Amino acid sequence: MSRLDLDRRDFLKISAVAAYTISGMPGFLARAAAQAGGDKTLVVIQLTGGNDGLNTLVPYSNPAYYAARPNIAVAKSDVLTLGQGLGMHPALKPLMGLWDQGQLAWMENVGYPNPNRSHFASMAIWHTADPSQASSEGWIGRISEQIGDPFCASNIGTATPLALIAQNYALPTIDSVDNFQVRLPAGVQDAFDLMLSAQRGGEAAYLEQATRSMLKHTSAVQANIGKYRAGASYPDSKFAGQMKDVARLIASGTGQRVLYTSLGSFDTHAGQRGDQDRLLGEMAGALKAFYADLETQGLAEKVVVMGFSEFGRRVAENDSAGTDHGEGSVMFALGRGVKGGIHGDSPDLEKLNDGDVIYRQDFRGVYAEGLTGWLNLDARKILGGDFRGPGWLV
């Protein structure tokens, strides 16, 4: 096949091979051919395992809390008081600066109808935004489909979560920003060179233009990643490294709408104070550094962080100084676009559902506000209905 006889069939075949190859790379390496629109980013943090909301946002003024947890309750003297009889776990102290600036929001009693205490089932519900468990598409995957950009979001981690699964494809997962570069397999680079050197019109010309744009954008992003210098000192932890990668992607101009990462495990059936205290401290230290980094880069106004867990824990401690799977829990959000404060009432520890805090705020309402108010997307289409949120955005 010479440079002069590259017909439409050959061109499309090469394009398909190239697209398949690039789709296996980190998401932003191929997103220039699609336009996501907007310049704001939502960072989603998954607290895997079922974080105990009562020891995160502590109802320290409620005697029932201490009666139910004689061994694992956070002492009143240690609570970081916020108001409404609630306060943060002491390990969250690095976030007090954001609270004082009105840039940290807590959402109380968040859950969904007919709660499921299975990790797998409940996480799937949060990932798909479908309590009926009928959907196989993630809510972030549906964002990708709505805006027509299969590279509008990435997961920073290892396995791609269901939240980032679209109908016909999975959005990319990046295990480490340090560990990649654009490398086309043997033969594919020659195919690209041949494809881009031929003269053509119509559909083939459009694909050529898109490919050139993609490669140009890829080179620019890679150069920016190489130039990135953290604007804050990050703690030495895996999660802090993930948040640093998130900051690097944002600062490098990837234009992605959603970046997703996880921390865990919060499945604290035994020895909860040791494990949860450590994880909350790891989260808080990393988020403080991340936000300081964004401020230094001049990007703080463009980023909001939202955190969730698949369920909370039971009110009463168990015999192993831990807690078992529960129902309602807390969500959090931080950033300049956040309406700081506590959204929702303090949990009712007298009126329980089989020993669990009763959910009062559907998590889809929290999602909806992020989709509509921050990303300027049609939440109704993405979530399959209208859901009222707690008002956590400015």
Please identify what each model-predicted range represents.
Residues 1-297, 316, 330-394:
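Feature for exported/extracytoplasmic and membrane-associated proteins, marking the mature portion
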Residues 312-316, 321-330:
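A post-motif C-terminal structural segment
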Residues 303-311:
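Acidic/histidine-rich, metal-coordinating catalytic segments
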